[in-house]
Regions:
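Positively charged n-region of N-terminal signal peptides that target proteins for export
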Residues: 1-4
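Bacterial N-terminal signal peptides
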Residues: 7-17
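Short S/T/G/P-rich N-terminal loop/turn motif that feeds into the first structured element of a domain
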Residues: 22-262
Length: 262
């Protein structure tokens, strides 16, 4: 395990995690359900000098074996920037983000076992030699899920958009609007295979209130969706961001499911 950040009011957490979900099923493996909140341990990481992503992946293979041996398996996800907000004047200050995902209790038990286990100490030292990370805790909740696609596709793309609730609006207002959007998405997903809210809980004081995560199977689906937005769908985004939430603007990450518990 490594290190990260996030915090939010219990009120906002309860409301955003009480939204109905439109899904083809329920199980996403590893104890994760698309119809209930799940725990997320996020590591925002920068490779140390001279280290590569190959070094990172070789360590993860050891980590998967360790979690299986100690009965604390979690889903492991890696994201790297694809269409980021970075440029030459404001470069990205991280190389990748890793997510350990599962039921909240299991993610916590993985941490406890990691911290107490003697056989994890060598692996911990090897990890710290490869990358420097900030560790944060969050909760995820699906609003729309194509279970078959999410369980089958390991390499996909995730659009992030960080938002704050607009002054004068309550979390219940967003809950109602999100439910309406999810209902429309169920009828016509336009290439989207998943939509969830990401709620920082520990270590995220510098982050907005929540993030929308929209999952696509490939870049073609991403840009097909953007074509629809360019042809008039932008009005829906404008209305949402005018009435309900003030958002930073979307970016795209390439996501790979590195490990699914058996």
């Amino acid at each position: 395990m490594k290190k990260i950040i996030i915090t939010f009011s219990l009120f906002v957490f309860l409301v955003f995690n009480s939204l109905p979900v439109y899904a083809d099923g329920h199980s996403l493996g590893g104890g994760i359900s698309s119809s209930a909140p799940f725990g997320i341990n996020a590591q925002v990481c920068k490779l140390n000098e001279g280290k590569t992503m190959e070094d990172y992946h070789s360590l993860n293979d050891k980590f998967y074996k360790w979690t299986k041996k100690n009965d604390v398996e979690v889903t492991v996800i890696n994201q790297i920037p694809f269409y980021s907000h970075g440029d030459f004047n404001n470069p990205d200050n991280y190389d990748f983000v890793e997510f350990l995902v599962g039921p909240h209790e299991r993610v916590g038990r993985t941490w406890d076992t990691w911290l107490k286990s003697k056989d994890a100490q060598k692996l911990k030292q090897e990890w710290e030699d490869v990358a420097t990370c900030y560790v944060k805790a969050a909760s995820g909740n699906f609003l729309y899920a194509n279970e078959e696609a999410l369980n089958k596709i390991d390499l996909r793309y995730v659009e992030w958009n960080w938002c704050n609730i607009r002054e004068g609006r309550k979390a219940e207002d967003l809950m109602k609007e999100h439910s309406r959007i999810a209902n429309d998405m169920e009828k016509n997903p336009n290439g989207i295979i998943g939509w969830l809210t990401f709620l920082p809980q520990l270590g995220g004081a510098s982050y907005p209130t929540f993030a929308h995560l929209v999952i696509y199977p490939d870049v073609e689906s991403v840009l097909k969706n953007k074509k629809i937005e360019a042809e008039g769908g932008w009005k829906d985004r404008r209305d949402y961001e005018t009435e309900f939430a003030q958002c930073n603007g979307p970016l795209l990450m390439q996501e790979e499911i590195l490990y699914r518990p058996q």
